Amino acid sequence: MDTSQVRILPKLDISAGHNFTKPSKRINESQDVAEFLSSKAYVDLMTFLLQLNRSLFPTKLPDGRVLTWELNSEAVEYSAPVRQLQQLLSKLEAILDEAPPDTGPRRFGNISFRRWYEMVESRAASLLEECLSKEILQMPSSDPGAPTAEVELLAYFLGSWGSPQRLDYGTGHELSFLAFLAGIWKLHGFPENSPGVEERAIVLGVIQPYLELVRTIIKRYTLEPAGSHGVWGLDDHSFIPYIFGSAQLAPAISESDRIPEEGSLSDAPAPGGVTKANVVERERKHNLYFSAIGFIYDVKRGPFWEHSPMLYDISGIQAGWAKINKGMIKMYNAEVLSKFPVVQHFPFGSLFSWERDPNAPSPAADAHIAATTRRTDEASTSSYLYSPKYIKATSWSYGSYKGALGNISTRWTGSPWRFYVCRPYANESSVG
């Protein structure tokens, strides 16, 4: 596949004129999710996610050598915008000292999180001005009465840290941070570079530090999971480290290769290593997937299969990390982007538009489908994301599970996404 055909999130054509607008809520009921999945915002978010995902696959050089992209890799160079975002995260971490956890009795999250969030909210504009370029923040609208780009970036930035009302954090907040970075990308905030170079720096230099800060916040203020499936969800709070971390351990690719669907890097730890504390402790310093697993070990007690059954099931997959990566992207579509409790608070402006994408298929006749997604393979045609699949989760039936935790007695043998039933459009083949 020609690298020119790899989909990249388009940047704004400033010369063509553009009007920014304050992002607002558009997903008010479950039926609105289908509209979201046909929107320009959905396409842009998935394009950026897949763009970042591809950059984390090990790189096969023409001379046969393989470059891997571990956490803290010296081979990854951080551009000035990435370093500025790192400074932004450091400033947010410093504000934690100004809001020590409340020592009084509580049933759920610590109310001091509200104080921390209020401080961040009151300083957000100045923080962005200190750490982002003026050209980005003050990019004007064509209409003199319309706001600058700052109003849109600010909305996604503030949506990235959890809910001060509910004292929770979840994948919807994680999605908001992804949108914040994608918005900067669309505004030409990251430099032009060779394919994958800046994307890797964004993941390893910004997203991973963001995840680490969020984990500190969760532990410090005992934030509840937001929009979680409980024990039957992948993770209480995050999803994207499992996508990017599995990519880090997949087979190496050249610039012209398609993303592999099976296999692993030759010296990658086995997926089953997540159940072994010593392996997790060793690998969490190098890999996003194991870093996320390590946080689970930090905050949960008891057998891994009991508190993280979905991840335990995935650990038994024999087809390698590329298979896991593919499944994670499917699951992200179905369990994050297609779930009303997760995306209901995502706001839409001009950078992430509620407007229908011209390549989107007609809405499904069945408005009550529980989860809706589209094929996420890299594509070389204008129909990139539009091999539409409507996916519905069947009842969970793992091993001898009967509906209560105590009834699990056998290790599951299938990948969790095999329990999604695909109903393809027209003559489209079903998701693999």
UniProtKB/Swiss-Prot annotation:
Q: Specify the domain of life of the species encoding this protein.
A: Eukaryota
Q: Name one GO biological process term.
A: DNA repair
Q: Name one GO cellular component term.
A: chromatin
Give the UniProt keywords, A-Z: Cytoplasm, Isomerase, Nucleus, Rotamase
Task performed by this protein: PPIases accelerate the folding of proteins. It catalyzes the cis-trans isomerization of proline imidic peptide bonds in oligopeptides. Acts as a regulatory subunit for PP2A-like phosphatases modulating their activity or substrate specificity, probably by inducing a conformational change in the catalytic subunit, a direct target of the PPIase. Can reactivate inactive phosphatase PP2A-phosphatase methylesterase complexes (PP2Ai) in presence of ATP and Mg(2+) by dissociating the inactive form from the complex.
Classification of source organism: Eukaryota, Fungi, Dikarya, Ascomycota, Pezizomycotina
Protein name, UniProt field: Serine/threonine-protein phosphatase 2A activator 1
Location in the cell: Cytoplasm; Nucleus
- Family membership: Belongs to the PTPA-type PPIase family.
> Which EC class is the enzyme in?
isomerase
Q: What is its EC number?
A: 5.2.1.8
Q: Which reaction does it catalyse?
A: [protein]-peptidylproline (omega=180) = [protein]-peptidylproline (omega=0)
